[in-house]
From Swiss-Prot:
Gene3D superfamilies: VC0467-like. GO terms for cellular component: cytosol. Belongs to the UPF0301 (AlgH) family. It holds the Pfam family DUF179. InterPro entries: AlgH-like (IPR003774). This is UPF0301 protein PFLU_5755.
């Protein structure tokens, strides 16, 4: 008998299908941080909010004026769960108080990474989010089976060097898919 292990999507992108009804995920590109039999966690990487790094730093260390460059560092809506919790995706390299290596990209969750970015000594490339997307055991698999998502291999170029408004289409193009031509209906010839 063949031992079949499940396929997990850690370190991949999820592309929301055009018919995605949930407003938290419609037209999103999500990076999957973790996916196991117990559930999944991801960060939406193409929805900037009105906040920028300077706004966050004013709350974290009000005694220091944030450098002007921090106004140009966007903060993304990472998902609907724990929207007051910050996550920073950045290239593997520098380690901070809470950094996890995710196969060529790192996830840092401690404030020191934000201070390092602000002070010009942190990662040069980053995606900063507030909140995350979470799925219970079997939930993401069920959504995939109902054609809510396409999966796409991770690409650091899309994450760090593609403007946020183009990331979804760039991931779809990597699969040679035009999202405007997709439907939620299956047909038979």
């Amino acid at each position: 008998m063949k031992n079949v292990s499940p396929t997990y999507l850690k370190h991949q992108f999820l592309i929301a299908m055009p018919h995605m009804a949930d407003p938290n995920f419609a037209q999103t590109l999500t990076y999957i941080v973790e996916h196991t039999a117990k559930g999944a966690m991801g960060l939406v990487i193409n929805r900037p909010q009105e906040l920028n790094l300077a706004d966050i730093l004013e709350q974290l260390r009000p005694e220091v004026d944030p450098p002007a460059r921090c106004q140009g560092v966007p903060i993304y809506i990472g998902g609907p769960v724990q929207t007051d919790r910050g996550f920073v995706l950045h290239p593997t390299g520098p380690k901070f108080q809470a950094t996890v290596d995710l196969e060529g990209v790192s996830l840092s969750t401690s404030q020191d990474v934000l201070f390092a970015i602000a002070d010009g000594v942190g990662p040069e490339q980053s995606v900063i989010t507030l909140g995350y997307a979470g799925w219970e055991a079997g939930q993401l698999e069920a959504e995939l089976a109902s054609n809510a998502w396409l999966t796409c291999p991770f690409d650091a170029e899309i994450l760090f060097n593609t403007p946020s408004e183009l990331r979804l289409e760039a991931a779809a193009a990597k699969l040679r898919v035009n999202l405007n031509l997709l439907t939620s209906q299956a047909g038979h010839a």
